């Protein structure tokens, strides 16, 4: 991770290695890290760096206040709407995109700031994370042969559902301490910025 610009503690680096190994197991479940911490701690950057490290396709969704399950199932294609083309006005949602991508290559799915979305989103994600599948109406889509690694970030705006917590590994991502901050900047330990 460090070679790609992410400076992690030794414990977090080990956890990321174990997380990568979990995706290689023969299992339908999708390995999931729930990264919690204050804004600016590097949670999203960790997920993006992991995707680069393993050479995976990155799928990203930014949650927003009152975001519902429909935003994970489909997405509005503005270009199709503007052209009044009904066939192209709706496109696959982020979960279906991740499942389809996993047929050809590994995927890193980043669900950023889940705590901003409505609580029912937590329950909606359960079958996807536990069984690697998504059911929309009468159609069921399943994970391909390649792994999907899921990173969920939270700034603790609301409680995350207990069932979702049980399907993910919770990790507190602290802001860099003084020594790590200086290392990131490439400065010596005795630099004056370390005393501010």
Kindly label every feature range from the protein language model.
Residues 1-194:
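AAA+ P-loop NTPase catalytic core and its hallmark functional loops
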């Amino acid at each position: 991770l460090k070679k790609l610009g992410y400076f992690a503690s030794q414990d977090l680096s080990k956890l990321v290695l174990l997380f990568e190994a979990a995706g290689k197991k023969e299992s339908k479940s999708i390995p999931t890290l729930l990264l919690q911490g204050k804004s600016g701690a590097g949670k999203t950057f960790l997920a993006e760096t992991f995707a680069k490290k393993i050479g995976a396709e990155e799928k990203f969704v930014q949650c927003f206040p009152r975001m519902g399950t429909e935003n994970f199932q489909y997405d509005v294609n503005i270009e199709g709407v503007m052209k009044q083309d009904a066939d192209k006005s709706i496109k696959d949602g982020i979960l279906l995109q991740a499942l389809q991508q996993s047929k050809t290559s590994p995927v890193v799915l980043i669900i950023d700031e889940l705590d901003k979305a409505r609580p029912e989103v937590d329950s909606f994600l359960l079958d996807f994370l536990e069984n690697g599948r998504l059911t929309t109406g009468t159609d069921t889509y399943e994970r391909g042969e390649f792994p999907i690694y899921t990173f969920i970030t939270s700034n603790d705006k609301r409680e995350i559902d207990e069932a979702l917590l049980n399907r993910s590994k919770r990790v507190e991502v602290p802001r860099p301490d003084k020594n790590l901050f200086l290392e990131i900047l490439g400065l010596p330990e005795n630099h004056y910025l370390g005393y501010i």
